[in-house]
Amino acid sequence: RRIAMIWFTSDTHFGHANVLKFSERPWDDIDDMNYALIENINACVEPSDELYILGDFSFKLTVQQAYELRKLIRCKKIHLVHGNHDKDWRQPEVADAFIVEPPIKVLKVDGVKIVMSHYPMADWQSMGHGSWHIHGHIHSQGSAYNDANLAQGLLRFDAGVDANEYRPVSLAQLHTRFDGVAWPARVKWPFWVNETGDARLDAFLAGEKRKVETLEER
């Protein structure tokens, strides 16, 4: 029997038919998506493991319908950081579904501080001391966003299913990913990542960066 592990995921959007289109998910039917995502979780996460879901577990479902899907996930200890589409999971009839966490959850494990939230942050607690930021919400597709973070020394990761082959990501995988990455001591706002892809914003940030460099040369 292996040692219990910690896993992260986000934005499963169980029950949300429109997510098949706007996130280009590879299923034609919402029930197929629901059960495939549950199978993927159960294939990775053992009942004794811990799973952090960083928001948007379901959408367009009643809390009871979402609860029935939750019961199909074998993991006993699932933490939920609420997203913008989540139900009130503190209701007595479903209170055993999740360990409901605050909007920003900080975990210290394996010598690392992990700052978790549904929404991504440009700057987070202890960023300059090597802390990680794990989030969801943005539905980045494929590895491009997470790879761009890594290339800039940002220990920030979108745990959403759309960015991770529709599977959870383990703490061990993130250790491997971030091992040896030189992070910035602090981030000045002109150097923040342009996550919009807007050419005008790129030009604006480039201009501000030149201003900062000019001031530092004086």
Briefly describe each language-model feature range.
Residues 95-197, 202:
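Conserved beta-sheet core of the metallophosphoesterase superfamily
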Residues 1-4:
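Short, Lys/Arg-enriched N-terminal segments with co-localized hydrophobic residues
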Residues 9-12, 62, 176, 196, ...:
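Residue-identity detector for threonine
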Residues 7-9, 14-106:
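Core catalytic region of metal-dependent phosphoesterases/phosphodiesterases
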Residues 16-21, 190-200, 212-218:
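N-terminal pre-catalytic "stem/leader" segment of glycosyltransferase-like enzymes
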